[in-house]
């Protein structure tokens, strides 16, 4: 027994437990058209009648929307969606399962789409057109050059691409020269063109002419008198009397070859013998432009980044002649201690530049150069930084190694750029650090670049324009390696020795470095103690001791730096880290000489003295 449900387009529903026979009899009385749907399941066939339409009041024929049959053998027959009869309610097509699967899909789609639509609506609500235009205007104003350059490059590439597309012609097949001679002897060559200025030979054969004729015949022009001239646009009429525009193409050559040198006489005699039409013509201007453009695109565009990098290396934009603009607080002469004699010399020069000392009424001239000489770490660069902070004039700071380049002549060019920039901002100061890198004695090496750079420096310091207010301050720790012409009066008129500080100088230097360091004891006592324990130390060594002491205090978790941290830092600076064999003897002897009233420290390394405290209240130094 099977159950059938019938749904018609006028919303009339047939349902109930009808057998196929009853259903067919029920429907056949009111049906105008019957179709049969046959389905197979498990080698069994089952037939069911499908209703084509109903008659209602004898006026309208209605189409069936759906017929569904279900049997006990799990057989189901769904009629296909089809408009059977045209009527008032049967004109629209309906899909099977529209109330089932499509409804679930539509619901899932709406659940996914709703939050996205809500998010888009919120963003559109917050969108401010005026603010967007202001941002766009600011972007254009800030990046106007880049936008113009990018637009121009894109436009040029677009025009080049359009030109290449419009001027594209079919390329002929390349054949050997021997094949060309063979075709000439065989008489199959119809026309030959010798291109002037090159070795290319274009030719067509008789087979090519026939193919071309067939192509023209297929077009079947009504008026044979209408010809297509080369490079002009004419009007043609086809069989259907429809006028159309035809643009003439250049002559298409099927084959091309390259002629052999000193074979022109043989080739011309052979063509004359065979009666072949030949001619010569220069390459057209359009093709020349196309060839040039292709060469530029394929050769120069890949080289453009390399040329740009090379230009940046050779240009003055990478020059060290840049005015020093430091965002950090500048260093003054109050921050320089321990080198009083050198500081006095530089203070005098700064005063002359600022106009505090009237040196002109006495007939004096500013020294052209000041050479700071001294061991490493004595504060030569710090003095130059103090000059930059106190002078109030343009200050140019460079390193001598920046003038030595791979390319010959670039060092001299950078020297010229540096002094030109200094002259434009005169009075000004130029500081050259580590002068021995470029100012070494000439003739000791084969480096011509270094010699040319030194020659340019000598010329700039004492050349024809010697009355300009440009002072050169240089620092070196190898004065014996400098060239004698560079150290003569008139170039470096003053040679200032920046020596190692004495005990009082070390105390002043320590006082400067300990200004921002919290101490457990009095800073004056610590400064005296460290200055007395560090003979021969320079400013860089003392700054390192203070920094090491602060690091040791941070390691042990202290809130301030103690004497033990400072003494440990002194031991690290003198003897290195973990060098316990050299520490006790040397430092103990020094402390015994300093404090003779204290007990002898010779026994402090004994096994019974490990827990005792050393002098000044700190633990033993081992």
From Swiss-Prot:
Keyword Signal: no
Gene: FTSHI3
Species whose genome carries this gene: Arabidopsis thaliana (Mouse-ear cress)
Protein name: Probable inactive ATP-dependent zinc metalloprotease FTSHI 3, chloroplastic
Span of the transit peptide along the chain: 1-42
Membrane topology field: Multi-pass membrane protein
Domain of life: Eukaryota
Transmembrane domains' residue ranges: 147-167, 291-311
Purpose: Might be involved in chaperone functions or play a structural role in the thylakoid FtsH complex.
Annotated InterPro entries: AAA+_ATPase, AAA_lid_3, ATPase_AAA_core, ATPase_AAA_CS, P-loop_NTPase, Pept_M41_FtsH_extracell
Any one Gene Ontology BP term: proteolysis
